Amino acid sequence: MALRACGLIIFRRRLIPKVDNTAIEFLLLQASNGIHHWTPPKGHVEPGESDLQTALRETQEEAGIDAGQLTIIEGFRKELNYVAWEKPKTVIYWLAEVKDYDVEVRLSREHQAYRWLGLDEACQLAQFKDMKAVLQEGHQFLCSMAA
């Protein structure tokens, strides 16, 4: 059976968008262990939790951002399936916008750094093909909503 994890692709919009549609910035966290990879906040589902409850709890634990500081974007849910530590893993992501552009990020010990990044920079830091793809799909979804 695959390990199951859930997370939020957190983003904010610059107050003054640039002409090239780089107004969207994604929050990525750098892991403290392993290869120090960059991902959105995510974590394993605990007994009795729904997937979305897990994503919200993990965001609060890993980035210090509470559910009340976020707006979940309807219509976007992506499932990634891959092998991690020689075990199959499923991760489900939703898009969530911070209500305050200057929201304070408070990292847990699981992470050593965070960055707000435009799509191209976020994809450069995201080392895994699946993560890059979900960031691109999320960005495309958000841009299509604005059109």
Swiss-Prot record:
Notes on activation and inhibition: Inhibited by fluoride ions.
The keyword Transcription is assigned to this record: no
InterPro entries: NUDIX_hydrolase-like_dom_sf, NUDIX_hydrolase_CS, NUDIX_hydrolase_dom, Nudix_hydrolase_domain, Tetra_PHTase
Post-translational modification N-acetylalanine, affected residues: A2
GO molecular function: bis(5'-nucleosyl)-tetraphosphatase (asymmetrical) activity; GTP binding
Cofactor: a divalent metal cation
Keyword set includes Oxidoreductase: no
EC top class named in words: hydrolase
Similarity comment text for this entry: Belongs to the Nudix hydrolase family.
Name of the protein: Bis(5'-nucleosyl)-tetraphosphatase [asymmetrical]
Organism: Sus scrofa
Organism lineage: Eukaryota, Metazoa, Chordata, Craniata, Vertebrata
Gene name as annotated: NUDT2
